[in-house]
Amino acid sequence: MFKPHVTVACVVHAEGKFLVVEETINGKALWNQPAGHLEADETLVEAAARELWEETGISAQPQHFIRMHQWIAPDKTPFLRFLFAIELEQICPTQPHDSDIDCCRWVSAEEILKASNLRSPLVAESIRCYQSGQRYPLEMIGDFNWPFTKGVI
């Protein structure tokens, strides 16, 4: 049975810079957007806000939905990745709460697009999607019957 990993990611932008999280995987420091898996009993928007806080210490809500990517990782793991935009008025300090995150960095789009240490090609693709200017209302991915009604199934 096909069971893709459902993940969320946040393109966080402030003062012309983008927020990336740095984590060490197999001895190499890699950049990613604040991102992670959808957990039971949370919406996609809630998951995005939670992952942002866990990985950066920033408490903010997504303002827009950007895109959903269907991706097969090199190890053949399938992903459905929901990408959100978060615009902050100014660059703010970060304090990761997730021990997997080494640090956070505010960098330019050019630095991300030219980086050789991206966790996946979706990191650069997310910046390109953000730069395209396409934004969708969060209601586009509305919740049905939320919270789940007990005894329905």
Swiss-Prot record:
<dbReference type="InterPro" id="IPR000086">
    <property type="entry name" value="NUDIX_hydrolase_dom"/>
</dbReference>
<protein>
    <recommendedName>
        <fullName>Phosphatase NudJ</fullName>
        <ecNumber>3.6.1.-</ecNumber>
    </recommendedName>
</protein>
<dbReference type="InterPro" id="IPR033713">
    <property type="entry name" value="NudJ"/>
</dbReference>
<feature type="short sequence motif" description="Nudix box">
    <location>
        <begin position="36"/>
        <end position="57"/>
    </location>
</feature>
<dbReference type="GO" id="GO:0017110">
    <property type="term" value="F:nucleoside diphosphate phosphatase activity"/>
</dbReference>
<dbReference type="GO" id="GO:0004787">
    <property type="term" value="F:thiamine diphosphate phosphatase activity"/>
</dbReference>
<dbReference type="Pfam" id="PF00293">
    <property type="entry name" value="NUDIX"/>
</dbReference>
<keyword id="KW-0460">Magnesium</keyword>
<dbReference type="InterPro" id="IPR015797">
    <property type="entry name" value="NUDIX_hydrolase-like_dom_sf"/>
</dbReference>
<comment type="similarity">
    <text>Belongs to the Nudix hydrolase family. NudJ subfamily.</text>
</comment>
<keyword id="KW-0378">Hydrolase</keyword>
<feature type="domain" description="Nudix hydrolase">
    <location>
        <begin position="3"/>
        <end position="131"/>
    </location>
</feature>
<comment type="subunit">
    <text>Monomer.</text>
</comment>
<dbReference type="InterPro" id="IPR020084">
    <property type="entry name" value="NUDIX_hydrolase_CS"/>
</dbReference>
<dbReference type="GO" id="GO:0017111">
    <property type="term" value="F:ribonucleoside triphosphate phosphatase activity"/>
</dbReference>
<dbReference type="InterPro" id="IPR020476">
    <property type="entry name" value="Nudix_hydrolase"/>
</dbReference>
